[in-house]
Design a protein with these regions (language model features):
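Short, low-complexity N-terminal intrinsically disordered segments enriched in polar/charged residues
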Residues: 1-30, 34-35, 132-133
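A solvent-exposed, acidic/Ser-Thr-rich amphipathic alpha-helical stretch
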Residues: 6, 25-84
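Short solvent-exposed loop/turn micro-motifs enriched in small/polar/acidic residues
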Residues: 11, 70-71, 101-104
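Short beta-strand segments enriched in hydrophobic/aromatic residues
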Residues: 32-33, 90-94, 123-124
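Short, cysteine-centered beta-strand-loop-beta hairpins and adjacent loop/turn segments enriched
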Residues: 67, 93-103
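Hydrophobic/aromatic beta-strand elements that line small-molecule binding cavities or substrate pockets
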Residues: 74-78, 91-93, 105-111
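A short hydrophobic beta-strand element
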Residues: 82-92
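Short beta-strand edge/turn micro-motifs at domain boundaries
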Residues: 103-133
Length: 133
């Protein structure tokens, strides 16, 4: 396992994580196109939730920005050009505002347009209770 490579997408990803930890939602949203689509499986019923545009993305990120700590270990990294696309699997450890820690696995995929994230699939692969998606 490891870290993001020193590529354009690797640097964008590192900045993405840095902005989450810094709780800088405006700068985080600036990484996305105005009409971006984020599909998330971070829901209590484990059904997909669709966030379109920056106002809805802001809603999604409010929950993530409430984390006290976030550690990411990349298990899989793949990127391509034309279109610029990223696919990663991450082992994630978080500490929430109550001080409770959780370990999960995510699968994230980005499709970029003009250097910004246009489509983001944020999928939970392994939930905090250890169950698989």
């Amino acid at each position: 396992m490891g870290h993001a490579p020193d590529t354009t997408l690797g640097r964008l990803y590192k900045e993405h994580i840095r902005l989450i930890l810094a709780k800088d939602i405006d700068a985080l949203l600036d990484q996305y196109t105005q009409d971006a689509l984020l599909i998330s499986s971070f829901s209590a019923d484990r059904k997909p939730v669709y966030f379109r545009g920056r106002d809805q993305l802001r809603e999604h990120f409010q929950g993530i920005l409430g984390l006290k700590n976030l550690e990411v270990d990349i298990a899989f990294w793949a990127e391509s050009e034309n279109p610029t696309t990223l696919m990663i699997v991450e082992a994630v450890k978080v500490v929430d505002n109550k001080g409770e820690s959780s370990t999960m696995r995510f699968a994230d995929s980005w499709v970029l347009k003009d250097g910004k994230i246009a489509i983001h699939f944020a999928g939970m692969v392994q939930y905090p209770d250890g169950s698989l998606a």
